[in-house]
Swiss-Prot record:
It comes from Escherichia coli O6:H1 (strain CFT073 / ATCC 700928 / UPEC). Monomer. Can also form homodimers and oligomers. A single active site specifically recognizes both ATP and CTP and is responsible for their addition. GO terms for biological process: RNA repair; tRNA 3'-terminal CCA addition. It holds the Pfam family PolyA_pol. It catalyses: a tRNA precursor + 2 CTP + ATP = a tRNA with a 3' CCA end + 3 diphosphate; a tRNA with a 3' CCA end + 2 CTP + ATP = a tRNA with a 3' CCACCA end + 3 diphosphate. CTP binds at G8, R11, R91, R137, R140. Comprises two domains: an N-terminal domain containing the nucleotidyltransferase activity and a C-terminal HD domain associated with both phosphodiesterase and phosphatase activities. Belongs to the tRNA nucleotidyltransferase/poly(A) polymerase family. Bacterial CCA-adding enzyme type 1 subfamily. The gene is cca. This is Multifunctional CCA protein. Keywords: ATP-binding, Hydrolase, Magnesium, Metal-binding, Multifunctional enzyme, Nickel, Nucleotide-binding, Nucleotidyltransferase, RNA repair, RNA-binding, Transferase, tRNA processing. Residues 228-329 form the HD domain.
């Protein structure tokens, strides 16, 4: 029996990145031998065991043979005669097909070290094309390591295109697509994930609402980058700088979906695109089974981001009504989330990356003023039932009006 550290732990250590999870491959052993040594079996489809002390995963070396469609259609073979090289060959990328023995020596049968040095994401073998989930995984790795200047090898991107055009991605379940997307949204450069999907044709298949934005022009005065798809990826990049939250980043990604519905004869204007995009946000989220709390914010951002841009022109009643509409009284975090997504929208434009966004500050200040109006004082004044709500709203409007007069500049 020989045990090797494999995959991501080896890769990230070589890149000088923090190692989170460690996975091990066991060569020359059997399930019974592992059980006798005190390991606990957890793998249902192939032999994976938990170490009795560390609880890290130890998998018997195995090969995989395509036996059906999609990313689950594989037959596994695990036996003592499966070599380490056999096991590493089934992995997706060469940089993930590295192993380390107990002496610290790196085993590299597929030139993963060279590709690490050259910052290349390259598939190990043609078997890559048998698993459509790998298209998403490579896009996610490209996003994860973009800050290290990694790029996808030409032949790997070509294979990803072939897989997409062959309809392989249609076998992916919504849950797996969302899981990979959610993971990509946590990276430093989530926009790279969607750009890679577009480069291989997968964006049109998995995110048609986003793909439809490319080639749709916006007014050059407000959008020097012109193309709404490019603007969308720029805003996502900016959102990633402003917030680590997946819901903020996803809502920013979806904020302009309504522009894809504008008839070409009305281009480059997109009047009412915010509310129009709400249905597309719901359609995308329902198809991918996106969690409700993420859907809820994306819906609100699509509907209200343009309103926040015009904040100095809003009357106090409209401002308080906005807080009602986003349910800020019960979910105050939404004020900050809307401020961040709206700022990402404005700064996600060519030449505006360092622009100030005072509307975000005014939104936050107005919220502090509105929420500081005490409910207790209204009740103590003798108001009852529905009158309490009405009087509280009236006092909030008055407080915001007073604040706006002093703090918010009047529109030209």
């Amino acid at each position: 029996m020989k045990i090797y550290l494999v995959g991501g732990a080896v890769r990230d250590a070589l890149l000088g990145l923090p190692v989170k999870d460690r996975d091990w491959v066991v060569v020359g052993s059997t399930p019974q031998e592992m059980l006798d040594a005190g390991y606990q079996q957890v793998g249902r489809d192939f032999p994976v065991f938990l170490h009795p002390q560390t609880h890290e995963e130890y998998a018997l070396a195995r090969t995989e043979r395509k036996s059906g469609s999609g990313y689950t259609g594989f037959t596994c073979y695990a036996a003592p005669d499966v070599t380490l090289e056999d096991d590493l060959k089934r992995r997706d990328l060469t940089i993930n097909a590295l192993a380390q023995d107990d002496n610290g020596e790196i085993i590299d049968p597929y030139n993963g070290l060279g590709d690490l040095q050259n910052r290349l994401l390259r598939h190990v073998s043609p078997a890559f094309g048998e698993d459509p989930l790998r298209v998403l995984r490579v896009a996610r790795f490209a996003a994860r390591y973009a800050h290290l200047s990694f790029r996808i090898a030409d032949e790997t991107l070509a294979l990803m295109r072939e897989m997409t055009h062959a309809g392989e991605l249609e076998h992916l379940t919504p849950e797996r697509v969302w899981k990979e997307t959610e993971n990509a949204l946590t990276t430093r450069n989530p926009q790279v994930f969607f750009q890679v999907l577009r480069d291989c044709g997968a964006l049109r298949v998995l995110f048609p609402e986003i793909d439809a934005l490319f080639g749709v022009p916006a007014p050059a005065r407000w959008h020097p980058e012109i193309d709404t798809g490019i603007h969308t990826l720029m805003t996502l990049s900016m959102a990633a700088m402003l917030s680590p939250q997946v819901d903020v980043r996803f809502a920013t990604l979806c904020h302009d979906l309504g522009k894809g519905l504008t008839p070409p004869e009305l281009w480059p204007r997109h009047h009412g695109h915010g509310p129009a995009g709400v249905k597309l946000v719901e359609q995308l989220c329902q198809r991918l089974r996106v969690p409700n709390e993420i859907l809820d914010l994306a819906r609100l951002v699509a509907e209200f981001h343009d309103l926040i841009h015009t904040f100095p022109m809003l009357n106090p009643k409209t401002i308080v009504k906005l807080f009602d509409s986003i349910d800020a009284w019960r979910k105050p975090q939404r004020v900050e989330q809307l401020a961040l997504t709206s700022e990402a929208d404005v700064r996600g434009r060519t030449g505006f990356e360092s622009a100030d966004y005072p509307q975000g500050r005014w939104l936050r200040e107005a919220w502090e003023v509105a929420q500081s109006v005490p409910t207790k004082a209204v009740v103590e004044a003798g108001f009852k039932g529905v009158e309490i709500r009405e009087e509280l709203t009236r006092r909030r409007i008055a407080a915001v009006a007073s604040w706006k007069e002093q703090r918010c500049p009047k529109p030209d």
